[in-house]
Amino acid sequence: MSFLVRAPFSARVLPLAEVPDPVFASGVVGDGRALLPDDDVTCVTVHSPIDGVVTKLKSHAAIITSTRGPSILIHLGIDTVGLRGRGFAPLVEEGDIVDAGTPLIHWDLGPVRGAGLSPCAPIVVVNPPGEPVSPEFDEALPTVGILDPLFSLPDSD
């Protein structure tokens, strides 16, 4: 049995190696995939990709930890911490219990694009460290809808 991670929003799927940030691209944070919203998308509601607990929440990022073990980082954009929250509206708090599909953050892409930053959003397994993931989408058509299967990893049970 495997642990399934779903897409938190509709977007084009990229391998981490294509993320314009050397830390994410090298896989040092963990394995996963990245989502790139289409150019005509102006706002995104980011949903939890798994059932779990919001263990860390910043305006531009969240970590959801499953009761089954894995922790998933959703990082919205590259170098977006410098926006100091502009364009991000958290909809949950740390400690909240969420289901896959629970809205986490409302993301206005205007400030990201206006600052010349990349809206590329890494979705990464941060725990267990070094755990490789398997794609769960059609790599020939690398787009996903909200809550479509994105990737899986071996179940820790």
PLM segments and residue spans:
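Contiguous, well-folded functional domains in the mature portion of proteins
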Residues: 1-157
